[in-house]
Swiss-Prot record:
Recorded family membership: Belongs to the LuxS family.
Name of protein: S-ribosylhomocysteine lyase
Entry function: Involved in the synthesis of autoinducer 2 (AI-2) which is secreted by bacteria and is used to communicate both the cell density and the metabolic potential of the environment. The regulation of gene expression in response to changes in cell density is called quorum sensing. Catalyzes the transformation of S-ribosylhomocysteine (RHC) to homocysteine (HC) and 4,5-dihydroxy-2,3-pentadione (DPD).
EC annotation from Swiss-Prot or TrEMBL: 4.4.1.21
Cofactor note: Binds 1 Fe cation per subunit.
Domain of life: Bacteria
Keywords, sorted A to Z: Autoinducer synthesis, Iron, Lyase, Metal-binding, Quorum sensing
Any one GO BP annotation for this protein: quorum sensing
Reactions it catalyzes: S-(5-deoxy-D-ribos-5-yl)-L-homocysteine = (S)-4,5-dihydroxypentane-2,3-dione + L-homocysteine
GO molecular function terms listed in the Swiss-Prot or TrEMBL record: iron ion binding; S-ribosylhomocysteine lyase activity
PANTHER family for the chain: S-RIBOSYLHOMOCYSTEINE LYASE
Encoding gene, per UniProt annotation: luxS
Length: 167
């Protein structure tokens, strides 16, 4: 099985909250695809609650599009990490970490503006595979934490995992 890029970085050196350009690629037609690691929690020390990350998934995807999409940027997908320490965001375009950070902070403010669980998009049995597993309160706590701590930048060259540790 090939070793994925996300496992070639040293998770013990990651800061959070922080933005990292996880991968860039060029499509055959010349479009730039950028994958961002949006790290909410320090790996192996903090974790997002299942209900909080699920609610955030429903809110964050739309709010980030509101703040980041434009003429040269279109978000393809924002998905939670299985380790529950953040999200991956794939998009067409090449925004820098500062642009992504600003959109992320604005999105967290938007999350705090949602005051009723009924206002969570797609929160119903037809559009969500676990529609009862949500917590607006947990999502608010996550957003407050990001805002209070601020968003830094994780650089791949600072996180390079020594080859002797690759398995």
């Amino acid at each position: 099985m090939p070793l994925l890029d996300s496992f070639k970085v040293d998770h013990t050196k990651m800061n959070a909250p922080a933005v990292r350009i996880a991968k860039t690629m060029l499509t055959p037609k010349g479009d730039n695809i950028t994958v961002f690691d949006l790290r909410f929690c320090i790996p192996n020390k903090e974790i997002l609650s299942p209900k909080g990350i699920h609610t955030l998934e429903h809110l964050f995807a739309g709010f980030m599009r509101d703040h980041l999409n434009g003429d040269s940027i279109e978000i393809i997908d924002i998905s939670p990490m299985g380790c529950r320490t953040g999200f991956y965001m794939s998009l067409i375009g090449t925004p820098n970490e500062q642009e992504v950070s600003e959109a992320w902070l604005a999105s967290m403010q938007d999350v705090l503006g949602v005051q009723d669980q009924a206002a969570i998009p797609e929160l119903n049995i037809y559009q969500c595979g676990s529609y009862t597993e949500h917590s607006l309160e947990d999502a608010h706590e996550i957003a407050k934490n990001v805002i209070a701590r601020g968003i830094g930048v994780n650089k791949n060259e600072d996180l390079s995992l020594d080859n002797s540790l690759l398995k």
